[in-house]
């Protein structure tokens, strides 16, 4: 007797994944932790960034290239905490990285979870309650940039800020510094003009 599989019906698996995602959302909301990370205060200039990623990943490289364009000017401090970002080991390693960061929480202003180059595959771990709760309850803001553009995962929903790509996450941080840089230049110009006018009067 031989069995040949000619087709696979993904509806059951997709249905299970959708149920898991919905269950995670409902549980986090019932525990009143769903919006906790969004309520954290991001420093005006978040220069000390803990990065959860893989050093050799395309997403991390995109993030670093963008940051490095202004790294010296804005004196950003990046600390990499490596983790598996998809698949069976993702939850365990990301949670472990978060715990390491938490043990040094005074050293950081913000955390960013960076993943890119793999499309929408392997994202189920980000809908898991265990990971989403760690992010929701983390003591400082978490910014996600896990590199996909379709359905938002639960982890992205509960994070302080969800950026579609690692590059967008880098831009999010840099924009904070751009804004202050412009403001300082404007104030400096006003001060110079004011002093010049006073000397001429």
Spans of model-derived segments:
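Short glycine/threonine-rich loop/turn motifs
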Residues: 50-201
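Short, glycine/charged-enriched hinge/interface segments at domain edges or termini
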Residues: 1-81
């Amino acid at each position: 007797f031989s069995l040949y599989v000619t087709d696979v019906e993904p509806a059951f698996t997709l249905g299970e994944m959708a149920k898991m995602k919905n269950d995670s959302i409902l549980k986090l909301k019932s525990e009143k932790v769903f919006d906790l990370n969004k309520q954290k205060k991001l420093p005006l200039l978040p220069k000390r960034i803990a990065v959860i990623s893989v050093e050799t990943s395309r997403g991390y490289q995109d993030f670093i290239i963008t940051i490095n364009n202004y790294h010296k000017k804005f004196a950003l401090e990046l600390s990499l905490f490596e983790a598996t970002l998809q698949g069976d080991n993702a939850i365990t390693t990301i949670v472990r990285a978060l715990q390491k960061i938490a043990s040094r929480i005074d050293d950081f202003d913000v955390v960013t979870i960076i993943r890119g180059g793999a499309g929408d595959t392997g994202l189920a771990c980000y809908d898991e309650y265990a990971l989403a709760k760690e992010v929701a309850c983390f003591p400082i803001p978490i910014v996600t940039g896990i590199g996909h553009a379709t359905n938002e995962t639960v982890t992205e929903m509960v994070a302080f800020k969800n950026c579609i790509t690692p590059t967008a996450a880098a831009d999010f941080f840099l924009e904070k510094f751009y804004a202050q840089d412009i403001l300082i230049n404007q104030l400096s110009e006003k001060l110079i003009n004011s002093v010049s006018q006073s000397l001429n009067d």
